[in-house]
Amino acid sequence: MRRAFVERNTNETKISVAIALDKAPLPEESNFIDELITSKHANQKGEQVIQVDTGIGFLDHMYHALAKHAGWSLRLYSRGDLIIDDHHTAEDTAIALGIAFKQAMGNFAGVKRFGHAYCPLDEALSRSVVDLSGRPYAVIDLGLKREKVGELSCEMIPHLLYSFSVAAGITLHVTCLYGSNDHHRAESAFKSLAVAMRAATSLTGSSEVPSTKGVL
């Protein structure tokens, strides 16, 4: 099963994240997170379990959308220094999620590797292209104009996607092509990334690593 559990604790944030890429049961050591979750929105149980509570509602919403449409089960709990601002929480949760994703993927054998998707949300349309390359790189262009969406700074949205790509060791190109509402622009971007990730991580039935180098 492609799954992982990661704890990442610093003086700024304390984070626990569990991921199962194929809706498999989440690692048992993450069960305690269920009792900590206070978010009512990003909390669903069933075949696909998604429980996210970062202390920032819109960030929970984005991680929920990412997991939902990528086909992941996900538990993510964070408490950070929000008394300062949202920077450390947004950045560090993305790092922890990227580490967990990389661990769950293993050596990347037997996956499609590349994925792309367009996703709309009403008037907004976003495109994401993913390469599970082992080489972290991110080009993010969302064109957000507001200072914040909810309690999440708009400047942190591209930064957290960059942080995720670095920790996961993957290449991301995420672009919002157009849209007049920043909530819609951001959410369509996360949904397009999710669908692209789902394609890139899909299994081909081969045992080979999809690279001429033989490793990723």
Swiss-Prot record:
One Pfam family it belongs to: IGPD
Keywords tagged on the record: Amino-acid biosynthesis, Histidine biosynthesis, Lyase, Phosphoprotein
Keyword Phosphoprotein in record: yes
SUPFAM superfamilies found in the cross-reference section: Ribosomal protein S5 domain 2-like
GO biological process, one term: L-histidine biosynthetic process
Catalytic reaction annotation: D-erythro-1-(imidazol-4-yl)glycerol 3-phosphate = 3-(imidazol-4-yl)-2-oxopropyl phosphate + H2O
List of residues that carry Phosphoserine: S211
Molecular function GO terms recorded: imidazoleglycerol-phosphate dehydratase activity
Protein EC: 4.2.1.19
A GO-annotated cellular component: nucleus
Superkingdom assignment: Eukaryota
Pathway: Amino-acid biosynthesis; L-histidine biosynthesis; L-histidine from 5-phospho-alpha-D-ribose 1-diphosphate: step 6/9
Annotated PANTHER family: IMIDAZOLEGLYCEROL-PHOSPHATE DEHYDRATASE (PTHR23133:SF2), IMIDAZOLEGLYCEROL-PHOSPHATE DEHYDRATASE HIS7 (PTHR23133)
UniProt family annotation: Belongs to the imidazoleglycerol-phosphate dehydratase family.
Protein name, entry field: Imidazoleglycerol-phosphate dehydratase
Species assigned in the record: Schizosaccharomyces pombe (strain 972 / ATCC 24843) (Fission yeast)
Taxonomic classification: Eukaryota, Fungi, Dikarya, Ascomycota, Taphrinomycotina
Gene: his5
